[in-house]
Amino acid sequence: METVGRLCQTPIQEHRPIMAFNRNALQIAAISWLISLLEPNCSPAAQAKIWEDLSGEKALAQVQRLVDFGPRPSGSEAIENSRRYIEDQLRRSGWQVTRQAFTDDTPRGKVQFVNLIAQFSGQGKSAPLFLLCSHYDTKTFDAIKFVGANDGGSSTGLLLELARVIGQHPNLAAKVELVFFDGEEAYDHFSETDGLYGSRYFAKHLGGDRQFRGGIVFDMVGDRSLDVTLPADSPSEMARGIFAAAEALKLRNYFTYLDREMIDDHSPLNAIGIPTIDVIDFDYPWWHTAGDTIDKISAQSLQIVGSVALYYLSEVALKR
């Protein structure tokens, strides 16, 4: 692993000092002066690789904090508590957060939903941005305690860690927008009016001046037995880019194609012309059961997905 902010390895010509007794001091001073001149001109290849800054352990700790709030269905006190926590973490990492609140009809009556939209402090609005998204709600169950460690928790914890890392690289952060969707889960069955409440609302109310070059939706990315399956409806160029990023990091065996399309928060975004890929591991035995608990989540899995995403962002999607 390369050292953060390592210096360019540019040869430095040695000069013999006139006074021998001052030789060491003069050498140190000369080297320090040359380094100060060379540092700003270091090539990007010589800088620390952003994906090496990500910590799966820190992402897992974020998942734990979310799970500690208990079940977090839309409209509940617990989701409001988790919402405040997410906002606080984002602001600590240098992001400005806006609440997009709305009320929608559901099979259980009217429910208030709140999307969280984060842009980096001082971010301009002229260039097209890249979306990084996760839903942070958990499915409503009456008969079981569903804390959604993987389904809702893992992707949100990872996105908070991505926010921390990207926030340390302002030039990259200026090209990214983070969205935490409320209401991804359907109350009965996914349909045009049930499920994906937050992403449908976000897509419908995008202003004409808002331009996005693409997006990634993270969902269920913490399974200890990781097998990320990109849905069949994934934008082909983005899928190739994700696979290439995984290959470059020698993590390709964790990524494959799903043999069918997937209904998820990427669907409304693709429908309005924002190419968005769903990074999801749907092969999860505890999906929508009381067994979706923190012990099923792995820091290594979060590390893998986050590293590939950062490589894809910095070396493929936002290279220029």
Put a short name on every predicted segment.
Residues 65-125:
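A non-catalytic alpha/beta surface segment that caps or lines the substrate-entry region
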Residues 5-11, 24-25, 29:
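Short, low-complexity intrinsically disordered segments enriched in A/P/G/S/L with frequent Arg
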Residues 72-74, 103-107, 124-125, 136-140, ...:
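Solvent-exposed loop/turn segments at secondary-structure junctions
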Residues 29-39:
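Bacterial N-terminal signal peptides
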Residues 58-65, 81, 85-92, 97, ...:
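Extracytoplasmic/secreted proteins, especially bacterial periplasmic and envelope-associated proteins
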Residues 44-82, 93, 223, 285-293:
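N-terminal capping segment at the start of a domain
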Residues 143-245, 249-253, 258-261, 266:
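Acidic/histidine-rich catalytic neighborhood of metal-dependent amide-processing enzymes
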Residues 103-105, 214, 223-320:
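Active-site-adjacent substrate-binding region
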